[in-house]
Amino acid sequence: MLIVADENIPLLDAFFQGFGEIRRYPGRSLDAASVKDADILLVRSVTKVDRQLLEGSRVRFVGTCTIGTDHLDLDYFAEAGIRWSSAPGCNARGVVDYVLGSLLTLAELDGVALPERVYGVVGAGEVGGRLVRVLHGLGWKVLVCDPLRQAAEGGDYVSLETILQQCDVISLHTPLQRGGQHPTWHLLGQAQLAQLRPGAWLVNASRGPVVDNVALRELLLDREDVHAVLDVWEGEPQVDLTLADLCTLATPHIAGYSLDGRQRGTAQIYQALCRFLGVNEQVRLAELLPKPPLAQIELDASTDLSWALATLCRAVYDPRRDDADFRRSLSDDPQQQRAAFDQLRKQYPQRREIEGLAVRLHGEAPQLAQLVSALGGVLV
């Protein structure tokens, strides 16, 4: 059996060497010739998998180590009888950590208290839903917009207009849909961006085209009160250099790039391939993940809640480092800039997640205990 895989998928040998030969390629350069003889194709979001890539090949199974599937032509898969799997929720916790770290940075810049802001989450799937649960656990006010879930479940969902008009912070976590009843391509265009409240913060860690980047650039040129945090970009790996300069935080599509999340994605498509082939799983992710470098954090019962929040989050991840690395990589040479974008992702340092972080409290501190629990930490 021949497996063709994106070279940046972690733990390829550990999970897949027992199935046959593995050939690795840069994800953006995968073409029909590369996959012609493959039985299994393993990709990330940078590879468009469609009729043009697969027609005439032997591919029977496609696995993507990502939550999103907008790079997969699922209609063609159905037509051609190709089975597929994504990795839902694999990097959700990493994205939540990214959002929390970004909020801490913005709060320090603006001198505001995070519990006093109103949060709007657009898209309540694996990532957005996890973020909503964390924010609710912290006791913060959260409004949620998700028309698909609202139609299926009812509940306390609000419109996008309500989010724009009432929320100080808007975090986007939608898939990219260009058609259908609820398209998300340019979900925030010029008209929507104009409705942002004074001093609003906008975070996009979903897909670049969910926000009209040209309209956002023009807004930021006109409104210094608005902060934008972008991890995803229209046309990436090419980036609008002016827009990047105007963003308070700018990063190269790494919000979900925790070590745990990336390896979890590989494990999930391994499990799906085992089901497809009808074989038992022989490899367990828990046996492959290294121990976290930070064994435990200790807090005194008198610790200020805001200080504890910042300490716990930044002990695991601080997006300011990624922002600085990204800005240093930006170049007026388009080819050099695209290469640097991909290189930052390829050589991304190991980063763990807050979830599971061991925390010891000295003394009775119910509010601190609640904060630790909301973040996903474990009291020891």
Swiss-Prot record:
Its EC number is 1.1.1.290. Gene3D superfamilies: 3.30.1370.170, NAD(P)-binding Rossmann-like Domain. GO terms for cellular component: cytoplasm. Substrate binds at residues 45, 66, 257. It is an enzyme of class 1 (oxidoreductase). Keywords: Cytoplasm, NAD, Oxidoreductase, Pyridoxine biosynthesis. GO terms for molecular function: 4-phosphoerythronate dehydrogenase activity; NAD binding; protein dimerization activity. It catalyses: 4-phospho-D-erythronate + NAD(+) = (R)-3-hydroxy-2-oxo-4-phosphooxybutanoate + NADH + H(+). GO terms for biological process: pyridoxine biosynthetic process. InterPro entries: D-iso_2-hydroxyacid_DH_PdxB (IPR050418), D-isomer_2_OHA_DH_cat_dom (IPR006139), D-isomer_DH_CS (IPR029753), D-isomer_DH_NAD-bd (IPR006140), Erythronate-4-P_DHase (IPR020921), Erythronate-4-P_DHase_dimer (IPR024531), NAD(P)-bd_dom_sf (IPR036291), PdxB_dimer_sf (IPR038251). Pathway: Cofactor biosynthesis; pyridoxine 5'-phosphate biosynthesis; pyridoxine 5'-phosphate from D-erythrose 4-phosphate: step 2/5. The active site is at 207, 236, 253 (proton donor). Pfam families: 2-Hacid_dh (PF00389), 2-Hacid_dh_C (PF02826), DUF3410 (PF11890). It is found in: Cytoplasm. NAD(+) binds at residues 146, 174, 205-207, 231, 256. Homodimer. PANTHER family: D-ISOMER SPECIFIC 2-HYDROXYACID DEHYDROGENASE CATALYTIC DOMAIN-CONTAINING PROTEIN-RELATED, D-ISOMER SPECIFIC 2-HYDROXYACID DEHYDROGENASE FAMILY PROTEIN (AFU_ORTHOLOGUE AFUA_1G13630). Catalyzes the oxidation of erythronate-4-phosphate to 3-hydroxy-2-oxo-4-phosphonooxybutanoate. Belongs to the D-isomer specific 2-hydroxyacid dehydrogenase family. PdxB subfamily. HAMAP family: PdxB. This is Erythronate-4-phosphate dehydrogenase. It comes from Pseudomonas putida (strain ATCC 700007 / DSM 6899 / JCM 31910 / BCRC 17059 / LMG 24140 / F1).
